[in-house]
Amino acid sequence: MIAQSTSNKNKTQSRTSGYAPVNGLNMYYEIYGSGMPLVLIHGGGSTIQTTFGNVLHGLAKTQQVIAVEMQAHGHTADIDRPLSFEQDADDIAALLRYLHIDKANIFGFSNGASTTLQFAIRHPEITNRIIVASTFYKKTGAHSWLWEMMSNSTFESMPHPLIDAFLEINPSRDALHKMYERDVARMQSFKDIQDEQIQAIKAPALIISGDMDVATIEHTCEMHRFISNSRLAIIPGGHGEYIGEITTPQNSTLIAATVSIINGFLNTTEVK
């Protein structure tokens, strides 16, 4: 592990980073702050910073943030095995065991939120609370334009900020292309989660979506109804705008409000 310090708007926070051997993968992670562990799981084609760079330090004021980069993304090299949200969830569980963490909160965005749902389903004994942001658990829960975009997707359509962020960490264009192709293929073959599995989630949940997000508001509300111990936040804006994801308009007021909502959820003694 490597101990460093990082500055954010005149606030210096201690950062520990390293690689964990999990299920044949060398998973990169960064740790900020102290308190109850909160694992951050980025979206598809992304890195820690592109997804969470604008909220990470605000969240680390009240808990120990453990930000990860999943298989084939950022600092974490690809290996010869399929990409799946189930495998990603098992990798997070293995990381927590490696770090000797018995229970954690999990915050996933987009693809990372699909992993978060799988984590709560597959590893309930180490799940404290979950934050499920901008996702759906069945194909019909997403707007049809998403699937049209996925079926016609080409590398040239990948957002340039995500390309630049990947290459800054890993200059291999072959690795970048492979990551892109594997992420797209995973979405093109998206597997529904059964309603009964969603209903079986017992961990307190905060479900967040933009009002112009990839998931329909109706589906997001259905997920809220199915997870009995959940809260729902529909926030103005598109996919990831409320956390300042790198490809979205940067609205500092909206981002600060989202951090406040998340911290409030995590620090509330009981969710009903």
Regions found by a protein language model. Give the residues of each.
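Conserved HGGG/HGGXW glycine-rich cap/lid loop of the alpha/beta-hydrolase fold
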Residues: 25-75
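Active-site loop/oxyanion-hole signature of alpha/beta-hydrolase fold enzymes
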Residues: 67-107, 249-256
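Flexible "cap/lid" loop of the alpha/beta hydrolase fold
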Residues: 114-122, 128-162
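Active-site nucleophile elbow and catalytic-triad environment of alpha/beta-hydrolase enzymes
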Residues: 181-197
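Catalytic active-site module of serine/aspartate enzymes centered on a nucleophile-bearing elbow/loop
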Residues: 236-272
